[in-house]
Amino acid sequence: MNKKFFSLAAFALITLGAQAKVKLPHILGDNMVIQQNSEANLWGWDKPGTEVKVATSWSSQKYSVKTGKDGKWAVKVLTPKASYTPLSITFDDGDQTTLNNILAGEVWVCAGQSNMEMPVKGFGNCPVKGYNKAVVRANQYKGVH
């Protein structure tokens, strides 16, 4: 009985190990924004010694990296200029994983208290210079609603 159990358990572990797939951190996923005109760090995990190929929809350049003994891998990819065109990144270790609907651009994080409640037009004695022209021109830019 024990011999059958251990044989079955060993088979199950070998089978599960053979099905390793690129794992990515939660910060990398569909619908993300990547920094424009830079080198973006991409990383993840896979079976130790596995070659992971990375391809981006905005470039013909292919990247290849081999996982370390701990299964970790990392690569830097060149990113395009800002655009509203959806992009994708494909990771391939023999089983493809693709991240879709990625935009290249800037993400600004603003924090504050009372200074964060100022309207675009400013306050009574503190107007924002040129705000009305900026608001009118905003509609000419794709993606500004």
Locate the predicted segments by residue.
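Flexible, active-site-adjacent loop/turn segments at secondary-structure boundaries
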Residues: 22-26, 30-32, 97-100, 114-118, ...
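Intrinsically disordered, low-complexity boundary segments flanking structured domains
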Residues: 9-13, 96-97, 129-136
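Non-catalytic, glycine-rich low-complexity segments
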Residues: 19-48, 102-110
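A generic structural signal for short, non-catalytic loop/turn and secondary-structure boundary residues
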Residues: 17, 92, 102-103, 137-139
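Secondary-structure boundary elements
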Residues: 114, 118-145
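Extended acidic/polar, glycine-enriched regions
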Residues: 43, 47-126
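Bacterial Sec-dependent N-terminal signal peptides
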Residues: 1-23
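Exposed boundary/loop context
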Residues: 5, 10-13, 37, 64, ...
